Amino acid sequence: MTQPPASTSGIMGTLSSWNLKILQINQLHLVHWNAVKFENFEDAALEENGLAVIGVFLKISETSGSPVSTGRPKPLARKLRPAQKHWVLQSRPFLSSQVQENCKVTYFHRKHWVRIRPLRTTPPSWDYTRICIQREMVPARIRVLREMVPEAWRCFPNRLPLLSNIRPDFSKAPLAYVKRWLWTARHPHSLSAAW
């Protein structure tokens, strides 16, 4: 089996040739870069702290366990077509409906499972962020992934610290509520000073 790089200091390969049952922190291959500053992934990877691990694609079977019990099976994450490998993800404008249906990704917020969702619902704080999307989903154990998330967030350059362990489900929330929750989470002292 081909082994991934030992660290995130160089350009990472793809997961297409790997079939890993358990992933380590240096084996996550969903990375971001500043789409305004860099035109391509290679230039960003050569920058100091250019690679930032923020998540991993999963292939969830209908019988697999989930840290959040919803009483119904999780859907299978679909594989991406080659033409969908790279996208500029922004809160606005939303991606086309075809992309929303065919691109599924699992996000993590600290130690909490968020859910499999379309790319159009990427968190608003990730504006002007481009994500390198791998074509194949990776089976992994939830327990191992939950242990990797805090370390992965610390590798994320120039991000504000997470102030809450709980993230509400924004799938059906109005945009105004989402913005208010994000502002409140990042400015807790401003609210207390106002009272």
UniProtKB/Swiss-Prot annotation:
Q: Which GO terms describe its molecular function?
A: carbonate dehydratase activity
List, alphabetically, the GO terms of the cellular component aspect.
Answer: cytoplasm; mitochondrion
**Pfam families, A to Z:** Carb_anhydrase
Q: Which residues bind substrate?
A: 121-122
Q: Which family does it belong to?
A: Belongs to the alpha-carbonic anhydrase family.
Q: What is this protein called?
A: Putative inactive carbonic anhydrase 5B-like protein
Organism taxonomic ancestry: Eukaryota, Metazoa, Chordata, Craniata, Vertebrata
